[in-house]
């Protein structure tokens, strides 16, 4: 009892770490046996107390935190503000994500701290609190999820879901929260299972590497050592851990007194003496040299002294102990305790959180504004960055506080601002070292609604790749998605309304009419426009759409949409010109289309050469209405044919020379040579555009002719416009070739195949077979010829279908079979025609043709002419009509496969088209204007636009035009080489006429000259400016104010979807904003209620200069508006006065120029430029006075929400698109902020759909060691995989080691020391890295275990090819010690380099093939060993276990070890060598110190990209 009274009574909590300390102290004092008795008593006591207490866990014990409500509310408030800023376009998506994660993370962490204090204060004996905080079960974060808040979760990809789970498990989760938490929960379950498996496999590999390492000797006699010194920044705790249990490599002196000798093991007493010495004399203290497994000289075992004390009983390790297996298990076992991966919060906290500086008191803050620069924080907040230390003063009422802000910090307040106490005034950046690695992360932003994409001038308009749609942002700017309602239609993309026009919503739903497309197939196709001014023709690459003609019932409109800078508008009064009015055709008054598609072509700069085709006219009679495919057949006649004897025998005629029947290609060439010099404008269309040969032909489809009205006309006037369908309706059952299913497009244009070519030109004249007797009769026909021109009198269209299929496709029809309409040919194709099938297999593809028609097997083959075109009996369709139409058939011979005698005749229906002499000019153009001057001549030329017997097959939904009529210009004056053309518009009293004016004199005045822009200026045309919008025209509806039932229409070709789209701007998408009444000149334009059409690309051309007044005529029937669009944003406006409310036309009163310059200042001309309608001239009045006003707003401007322009705030973000005197209308838009370097997807003006990718951000995320943590990190190091990128200075250092050390020392020394240095450095670095991971998880492992493993991993060198030695082959892996010994034994030096192998490779590169085979790849290893004749000396444990021998450890150890007599004398030899040894150590190995992880060498030594030691290999 007396003894017990003297003991200290300890009354405190005891947790896991305290228990560990207690046990270790007991062992030190009492030894193992006595300690076990004491621990038994503690165990009994614990169980007894637990039974008495009977702690149980109930749901009532889960106490929630009272402050949680307002903490969450506060976080929600911040999130709401953040969302608002994002909506305004003030922060971008990455900043929003970062800030959101940070807000909720901070809230969650704060709640965790609150939870601890809450338990401690309210209920310290709470079972939950007791269990988790004693470490018995669970931990704080798990309890936090039970009673605090679950917080942010990661999705399966490891990305943060920025919707936090606000509930805890006590309160219960909502459905959304439950689903989100399932992600994290599932991940946790999977992680646990994977972690267990991974840890087990790691242990197996580790044991495999070191299973043969056994303590076999007392002393290896090494003279190497590792120095340990607290001066290297090592903490005292780490210093003690490193030294205890080691063996000294040198005597240790204090002054002249030796306090410890070599080979003495270090206990706690000796360590304490070292520490007191260091404290007393920190600078004089010498480093302590110790022996470690790294220094042991043995190859495949280890000595007692290098290993040190055994951890189990505190004495030197015994001989025969399997320390390798112990080391492997010591490292592998805690693997299950390591987390597999940290909870990674979206890259926010990896760079270390910033320290905040708070204001010490209320007051006014002041600092030097010149020392700071405005910037954005990583959350998108405005801030100031100070580059040097900044002194801030805070002036409160009675005291002046001074705060110093370190450099590179962010100041979050403004100068002279009033701050409150504890307000955050600055943010100090976390210390970022040069070795802080970053990784680039991509984040995609998707569009939240349908809309049209716009951007500012800050986006490169040239895509990153020539035909791509990706653009880089050179600086931070906004992208806008203008809101639209999508009206989708498979055929509709044209409206009679102009872009930005308003209309009633029901206008096209009640009519039920189709709306057709007016934009070409693709805007981004290249014209090659030739410059005619230079000495050589320079090629200018510009984007342009072909000229086109619009028809709207009352007028034809010319839209030369070649870019503004490609032609001159002439302004000089000349008599040498004439004008062609493009006039409305009187006879067709009731129909909304013009009967002729006259397309005027004004070439580049308006220069016309001789024999230039100035206009095209496509006669609707020669149009193939339905979208079938087929063959055109015709023949040419020369004048001599007229006079040839008609009675000649037909056989002779068939044999007549071929050159009389020239092919269409030659004919076309003649036309080109005679009448055309500028081919590029028209000829290259087919190749480069991929659109039909005739871009003007498709009146129905492209220019808005309504299909139902066209069909009505078809039936009314079958004779004139009869389609193939109508012609064959009477013979439907006979030929079965109705074309109703042939509307879809077909494959490629392909010539008819060789098998029919013998009949193609066989019968150039028309013959008829009278049906009853199969007699052949020849009938001549009349020819129409111009003087020297070969003329076609009649041509035929024969239906045929061709499919080009891949070679591999499986056909569902047989060759020579007969099929019906809509038969399935392959998996995805169906036939449009019925008839005979012919299949031809070629090398690259399979051709499948379908010939329509009947099949006859004639009795006598010689009575049928192959390849004949035969008219059937004439039939009158209408008795009143005197005109007769003929139906023709085309007779073709066909052979039956593999039968030479058997023939059959294919009778195919053909559509005949007659050609007449050409139209009289008077029918096309009024005569009077043409007779103004006799010096210019026009003549008409017809040519066929399809080659003879080529298969005409359309890719697009277009109709084929067979014949084109061209208007060819010529003149008499020999000396004049060129004429000038321009467009003139005359308006007077409701009459509008548009003229093409051609004059022979070059004008002296023109608005603009063509500028040769640099490539960069030209590249602006890359961006898809939608000329559709500027070229469409107004409806006849009057302009009305916005109301509920009106919408504005804009048309656009949608490139990436199959169907075309209409943009409908409804009233819900626009908002009208009234000006403040007293504001001065609100819109900067003094006009009476102007209606200003907005150019889509206003605002794109700020950076380019150009001359004033380039006019792109957009001539329309209603608004009579011109666009003036140049590079410096000139907008031409005009006063529109209503002449008469009942009339649909507005009269041009006068034109007014307004110049909007780069700074959005508007300058108006006082004088008008008047158009004199009677003399067809422009008069320029002198303009002396200027009036300048500055506009607060301008058309096309984008305004963010909540911007204060006037007294009232703007309620919605958007683009200004109507400006009136007292108000303006905003089209709603959603801004997206995009930072520098972001990639924009899509084209300017392109329609995007909800969910389309909009922007890709690339942002840097600090990458520190938390990306892979725990077990994967340990495994990564052991397997020698790349961990981080190598720091640049370290890379240089390794290069130096490899190159210079061998060069300095030369010979064997160089390679020996180079490899030694490298290996020594890498070993220490690796040990530190692994320890860092384990210590971060609270796991204590002795260094020597890790050292044994690392020793094996780094013990190999690779023999290099530098020197040829007979011992090892180049590239062979050998142990470092073996290489050194071989080098000493040989006269010749061995060259080798250090290499690092992972544990798996080391396991397969041991001296024992049995051990390798038992690990992996058994068959390969054994086969290789047999071929090489390897010998296994059975030194390890595994080999003996496999073969059933005695393992060489413990008692079996004695049989394997023989005492060497020189062991006894070893110590004395070492003493003699000591002088040399210490010098060598000083030279080479002083830097191989055990330092803490602060040193950049040890931190980053190992961080190469592939294998860490590739520089040495």
Curated annotation (Swiss-Prot):
Coiled coil: none annotated. Keywords: Chloroplast, DNA-directed RNA polymerase, Metal-binding, Nucleotidyltransferase, Plastid, Transcription, Transferase, Zinc. Residues 644-769 are annotated as: Disordered. The keyword Oxidoreductase does not apply. GO terms for cellular component: chloroplast; DNA-directed RNA polymerase complex; mitochondrion; plastid. InterPro entries: DNA-dir_RpoC2_beta_pp (IPR012756), RNA_pol_beta''_euk (IPR050254), RNA_pol_Rpb1_3_sf (IPR042102), RNA_pol_Rpb1_4 (IPR007083), RNA_pol_Rpb1_5 (IPR007081), Rpb1_funnel_sf (IPR038120). Residues 659-679, 726-737 have a biased composition (Basic and acidic residues). GO terms for biological process: DNA-templated transcription. Its EC number is 2.7.7.6. Its cofactor is Zn(2+). In plastids the minimal PEP RNA polymerase catalytic core is composed of four subunits: alpha, beta, beta', and beta''. When a (nuclear-encoded) sigma factor is associated with the core the holoenzyme is formed, which can initiate transcription. Belongs to the RNA polymerase beta' chain family. RpoC2 subfamily. NCBIfam families: rpoC2_cyan. HAMAP family: RNApol_bact_RpoC2. This is DNA-directed RNA polymerase subunit beta''. It comes from Oryza sativa subsp. indica (Rice). The lineage of its organism: Eukaryota, Viridiplantae, Streptophyta, Embryophyta, Tracheophyta.
């Amino acid at each position: 009892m007396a003894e017990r009274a003297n003991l200290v009574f300890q009354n405190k909590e005891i947790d896991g770490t305290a228990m560990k300390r207690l046990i270790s102290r007991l062992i030190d004092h009492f030894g193992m046996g006595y300690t076990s008795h004491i621990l038994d008593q503690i165990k009994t006591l614990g169980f007894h107390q637990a039974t008495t207490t009977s702690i149980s866990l109930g749901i009532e014990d889960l106490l929630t935190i009272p402050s949680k409500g307002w903490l969450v509310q506060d976080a929600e408030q911040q999130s709401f503000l953040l969302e608002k800023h994002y909506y305004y376009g003030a922060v971008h998506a990455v900043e929003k994500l970062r800030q959101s994660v940070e807000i909720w993370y901070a809230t969650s962490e704060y709640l965790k701290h609150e939870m601890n204090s809450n338990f401690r204060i309210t209920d310290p004996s709470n079972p939950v609190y007791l269990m988790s905080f004693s470490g018995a079960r669970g931990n704080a974060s798990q309890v936090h999820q039970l009673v605090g808040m679950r917080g942010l979760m990661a999705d399966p990809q490891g990305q943060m879901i920025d919707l936090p789970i606000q509930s805890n498990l006590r309160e219960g989760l909502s459905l959304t929260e439950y689903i989100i938490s399932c992600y994290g929960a599932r991940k946790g379950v999977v992680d646990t299972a994977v972690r267990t498996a991974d840890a087990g496999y790691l242990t197996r590999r580790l044991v495999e590497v070191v299973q043969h390492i056994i303590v076999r000797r007392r002393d290896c006699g090494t003279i190497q050592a590792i120095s340990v010194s607290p001066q290297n920044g090592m903490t005292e705790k780490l210093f003690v851990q490193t030294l205890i249990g080691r063996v000294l490599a040198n005597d240790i002196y204090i002054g002249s007194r030796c306090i410890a000798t070599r080979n003495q093991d270090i206990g706690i007493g000796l360590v304490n003496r070292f520490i007191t010495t260091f404290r007393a004399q920190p600078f004089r203290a010498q480093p302590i040299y110790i022996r470690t497994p790294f220094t042991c000289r043995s190859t495949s075992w280890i000595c007692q002294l290098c290993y040190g004390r055994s951890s189990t009983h505190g004495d030197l390790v015994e001989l025969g102990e399997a320390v390798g297996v112990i080391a492997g298990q010591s490292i592998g076992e805690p693997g299950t305790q390591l987390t597999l991966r940290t909870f990674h919060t979206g890259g926010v906290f990896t760079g270390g959180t910033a320290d905040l500086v708070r204001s010490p008191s209320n007051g006014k803050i002041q600092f030097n504004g010149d020392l700071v620069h405005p910037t954005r924080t990583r959350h998108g907040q405005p801030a100031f960055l100070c580059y040097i230390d900044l002194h801030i003063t805070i002036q409160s009422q009675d005291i002046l506080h001074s705060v110093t802000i370190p450099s590179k910090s962010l100041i979050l307040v403004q100068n002279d601002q009033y701050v409150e106490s504890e307000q955050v005034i600055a943010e100090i950046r976390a210390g970022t070292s040069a070795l802080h690695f970053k990784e680039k992360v991509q984040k995609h932003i998707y569009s939240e609604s349908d809309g049209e994409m716009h951007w500012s001038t800050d986006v490169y308009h040239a895509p990153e790749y020539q035909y791509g749609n990706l653009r880089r942002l050179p600086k931070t700017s906004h992208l806008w998605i203008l809101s639209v309602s999508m009206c989708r239609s498979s055929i509709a993309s044209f409206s009679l309304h102009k872009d930005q026009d308003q209309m009633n919503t029901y206008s096209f739903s009640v009519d039920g009419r189709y709306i057709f497309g007016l934009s070409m197939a693709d805007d981004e196709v290249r014209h090659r426009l030739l410059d005619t001014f230079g000495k050589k023709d320079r090629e200018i690459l510009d984007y342009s759409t072909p000229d086109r003609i619009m028809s709207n019932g009352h007028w034809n409109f010319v839209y030369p949409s070649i870019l503004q800078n490609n032609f001159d508008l002439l302004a000089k009064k000349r008599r040498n010109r004439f004008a062609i009015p493009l006039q409305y055709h009187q006879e067709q008054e009731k129909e909304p289309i013009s009967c002729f598609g006259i397309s005027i072509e004004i070439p580049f700069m308006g220069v016309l050469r001789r024999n230039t085709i100035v206009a095209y006219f496509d006669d609707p009679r020669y149009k193939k209405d339905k979208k079938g495919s087929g063959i055109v057949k015709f023949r040419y006649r020369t004048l001599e044919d007229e006079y040839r004897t008609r009675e000649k025998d037909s056989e002779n005629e068939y044999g007549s020379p071929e050159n009389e029947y020239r092919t269409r290609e030659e004919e076309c060439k003649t036309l080109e040579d005679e009448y055309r010099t500028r081919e590029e404008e028209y000829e290259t269309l087919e190749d480069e555009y991929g659109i039909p040969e005739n871009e003007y032909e498709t009146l129905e489809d492209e220019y808005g002719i309504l299909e139902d009205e066209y069909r009505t006309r078809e039936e009314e006037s079958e004779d004139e416009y009869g389609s193939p369908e109508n012609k064959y309706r009477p013979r439907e059952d006979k030929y079965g070739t109705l074309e109703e299913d042939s509307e879809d497009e077909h494959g490629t244009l392909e010539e008819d195949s060789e098998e029919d070519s013998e009949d193609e030109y066989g019968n150039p004249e028309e013959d008829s077979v009278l049906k009853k007797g199969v007699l052949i009769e020849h009938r001549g026909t009349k020819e129409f010829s111009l003087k020297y021109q070969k003329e076609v009198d009649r041509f035929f269209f024969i239906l045929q279908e061709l499919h080009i299929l891949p070679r591999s496709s499986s056909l569902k029809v047989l060759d020579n079979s007969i099929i019906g309409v809509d038969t399935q040919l392959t998996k995805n194709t169906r036939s449009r025609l019925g008839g005979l099938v012919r299949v031809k297999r070629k090398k690259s593809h399979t051709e499948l043709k379908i010939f329509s028609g009947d099949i006859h097997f004639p009795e006598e083959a010689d009575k049928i002419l192959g390849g004949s075109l035969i008219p059937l009996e004439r039939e009158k369709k209408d008795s009143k009509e005197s005109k007769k139409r003929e139906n023709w058939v085309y007779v073709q011979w066909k052979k039956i496969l593999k039968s030479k005698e058997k023939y059959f005749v294919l009778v195919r229906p053909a559509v005949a088209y007659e050609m007449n002499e050409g139209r009289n000019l008077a029918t096309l153009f009024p005569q009077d204007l043409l007779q103004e001057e006799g010096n210019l001549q026009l003549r008409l030329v017809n040519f066929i636009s399809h080659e003879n017997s080529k298969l005409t097959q359309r890719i697009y939904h277009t109709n084929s035009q067979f014949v084109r009529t061209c208007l060819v210009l010529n003149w008499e004056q020999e000396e004049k080489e060129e004429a000038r053309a321009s467009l003139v518009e005359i308006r007077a009293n409701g009459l509008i006429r548009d003229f093409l004016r051609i004059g022979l004199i070059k004008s002296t005045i023109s608005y603009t000259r063509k500028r040769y822009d640099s490539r960069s200026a030209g590249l602006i045309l890359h961006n898809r400016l939608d000329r559709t919008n500027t070229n469409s025209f107004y409806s006849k509806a009057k302009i009305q104010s916005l109301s509920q039932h009106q919408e504005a229409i804009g048309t656009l070709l949608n490139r990436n979807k199959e169907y075309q789209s209409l943009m409908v701007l409804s009233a819900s998408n626009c908002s009208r904003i009234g000006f403040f009444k007293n504001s001065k000149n609100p819109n900067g334009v003094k006009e009476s209620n102007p209606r200003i059409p907005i150019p889509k690309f206003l605002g794109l051309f700020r950076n380019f200069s150009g001359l004033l007044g380039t006019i792109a005529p957009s001539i329309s029937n209603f608004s009579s508006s011109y666009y003036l669009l140049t590079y410096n944003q000139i907008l031409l406006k005009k006063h529109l006065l209503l002449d008469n409310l009942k009339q649909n036309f507005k009269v041009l009163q006068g034109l007014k120029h307004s110049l909007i310059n780069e700074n959005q200042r508007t300058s108006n001309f006082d004088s008008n430029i008047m158009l004199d309608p009677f003399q067809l001239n422009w008069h320029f009045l002198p303009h002396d006075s200027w009036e300048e006003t500055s506009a607060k707003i301008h058309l096309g401007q984008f305004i963010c929400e909540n911007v204060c322009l006037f007294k009232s705030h703007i309620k919605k973000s958007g683009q200004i698109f109507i400006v009136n005197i007292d108000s303006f209308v905003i089209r709603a838009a959603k801004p997206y902020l995009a930072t520098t370097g972001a990639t924009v997807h899509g084209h300017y003006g392109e329609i995007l759909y909800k969910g389309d990718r909009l922007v890709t951000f690339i942002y840097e995320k600090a990458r520190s060691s938390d990306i892979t943590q725990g077990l994967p990190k340990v495994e990564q190091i052991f397997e020698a995989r790349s961990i981080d990128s190598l720091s640049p200075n370290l890379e240089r250092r390794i290069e130096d080691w490899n190159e210079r050390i061998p060069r300095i020392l030369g010979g064997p020394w160089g390679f020996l020391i180079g490899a030694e240095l490298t290996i020594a450095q890498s070993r220490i670095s690796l040990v530190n890295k692994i320890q860092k991971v384990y210590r971060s998880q609270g796991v204590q492992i002795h260094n020597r275990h890790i050292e044994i493993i690392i020793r094996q991993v780094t013990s190999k060198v690779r023999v290099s090819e530098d020197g040829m030695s007979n011992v090892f082959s180049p590239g062979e892996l050998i142990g470092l010690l073996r290489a050194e010994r071989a080098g000493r034994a040989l006269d010749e030096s061995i060259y080798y380099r250090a290499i690092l192998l992972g544990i798996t490779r080391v396991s397969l590169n041991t001296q024992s093939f049995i051990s390798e085979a038992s690990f992996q790849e058994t068959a390969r290893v054994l086969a290789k060993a047999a071929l090489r004749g390897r010998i296994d000396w059975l030194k390890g444990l595994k080999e003996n276990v496999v073969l059933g021998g005695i393992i060489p450890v413990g008692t079996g150890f004695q049989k394997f070890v023989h005492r060497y007599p020189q062991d006894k004398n070893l110590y004395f030899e070492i003493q003699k060598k000591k002088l040399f040894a210490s010098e060598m150590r000083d030279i080479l190995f002083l830097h191989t110190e055990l330092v803490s992880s602060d040193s950049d060498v040890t931190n980053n030594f190992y961080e190469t990209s592939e294998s860490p030691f590739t520089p040495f290999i």
